[in-house]
Amino acid sequence: MESTDSSPPLSMTDTEKKGDAVTTVTDESSVSEYERFLHLENVFSGASRKKLLRKLDLRLLPTLSFLYLMCSLDKSNAGNAKLFGLLEDLGMSGTQYNLALMYFFFTYGLSEPVSNIMLRRVGPKIWFPFIVCAWGLITTLTSQASSYAGFVVIRLMLGITEAGLYPGAYFILSMWYTPKEIGTRMAIFYGANTTAGAFGGVIAYGVGSLDGNLGWRAWRWLFLIEGCITIFAGLACLFCLPAFPHQYQAGKGTKWLTDEELEYASLRVKYANGPVSSTYTFRWSDVVAAAKDRKTYFMMMLFWWGGSVPTYSLSYTLPTMVANLGYTAVKAQVMTTPPYIFATCVCVAVGYISDQTQRRYLCIMGAYTLGLIGIIILWITVHHPSIPGVSYFAIFLAAAGYSAQAPIVGAWTASNITNPSKRAAAIGLLMLLGSVGGGSIGSNIYISSEAPTYPLGFGFSVGATVLGAMIPATIHWFLMRKENKRRGGLDVAEIERKYTTEELGEMGEDSPLFRFVL
């Protein structure tokens, strides 16, 4: 199989050693910065590099993961609220409930690329506290809903404000971590989503005891408590969340990194693919380039059909599915916790393996296969109420498989788009379709009238995974592998004579020296 190292073959003239490779840079300013990077590579070797990574991990991962935990709770707590009488109190039918969930994804998906562009322009220290506090406030207002129309309006507003967290966090991680490190970090971050599934059940179980307090139903308490926690988290972002590394001025860095650590943190990502780097200046042309790139649409297919459709449908329907196995509404909330804990562990493990092997495609296909096996077993066993244990086991597999694919799809995208502005736009665009298409479909395919067998829901999930995700993933992998082979046969010296360093940098991943991560 082809090597998936994304570092390009380096030049063979005006040389400077970097390990076993020989490098060339022709522009004087580039030489200075790249030589500085090579020097820092030697300074930050072994224990000092691990120390830097620990600092980055401790600053970024807990903060972003907790924000995503709250985002996932505030987005999916409607499934828990349903069991606490939300539909009856607001006079909603099951169909209206599904439609309200679907409407959320329209504003959510349409706002994702816009939010990521804003993040790229103003930075995370300003943008993230704003959007987190905004959706926390809207979540608390959900506790005051008194009609179906009011609930729909609130869900539309929630979609606008929550949209920036998921794609934004992926982009932030891609600005601090190299392609060989990012899969594990995205998996840890995404694990907060599955952890939310676990905590959501526990929190809902605890909030259930508040039913009737101060004349409020339990579902109102659920939205109020989770919304207040989110507002607090948004305010904490002002102090905990760092800016992008290139936004810090020389000599005016940050207290948690030394000036040298901050400089290396920025340069090691900038030159992760060799001496030719993309521009860090925001340009609208890079956004347009992302919209025209074939890679963006292949990753959209994966995120839409293999990720969002089965994941969202499982998230909103799991409490009801577990209740259909014979558990009470309150007990069903708790029983949703173990599958999500298992899914979190599998998610992080797959992310780590994908980083160590740099085989993103194989890890994605493995995750799809695991989720597919779980859905098929569950589809079969729901027809046999006498074996609820097998159905419950299948939920473990489905939750783990469909959760594990998401961060690897994000890492695969980030690793193969070098320009930061184009990468931000591409991540936002692929999540737009994933959220609008996947969320709107996923929230409507498990129809209450078809419970507990859900023939449409299970059948659609299986078909979406195979036809919409596994086949496009294979085509995408094949095309990139073919291009890597073609570029491997080119004459490096001829490329250097034909193009300047600046021209190669402008090409980004289209440069003949770039190799795609497979």
UniProtKB/Swiss-Prot annotation:
Keywords: Cell membrane, Glycoprotein, Membrane, Transmembrane, Transmembrane helix, Transport
Topology within the bilayer: Multi-pass membrane protein
Main location: membrane
A Pfam family: MFS_1
Biased composition annotated in UniProt, kind: Polar residues: 1-13
GO molecular function: transmembrane transporter activity
Regions crossing the membrane: 99-119, 122-142, 156-176, 187-207, 221-241, 298-318, 334-354, 362-382, 392-412, 427-447, 455-475
Subcellular location: Cell membrane
Region (Disordered): 1-24
InterPro entries: MFS, MFS_dom, MFS_trans_sf
SUPFAM superfamilies, per the entry: MFS general substrate transporter
Residues annotated as glycosylated: N416
GO CC terms, sorted: plasma membrane
Role, per record: MFS-type transporter; part of the gene cluster that mediates the biosynthesis of communesins, a prominent class of indole alkaloids with great potential as pharmaceuticals. With the MFS transporter cnsL, is most likely responsible for cummunesins secretion and thereby may contribute to intrinsic resistance.
Family: Belongs to the major facilitator superfamily.
Name by which UniProt lists this protein: MFS-type transporter cnsO
Protein's gene: cnsO
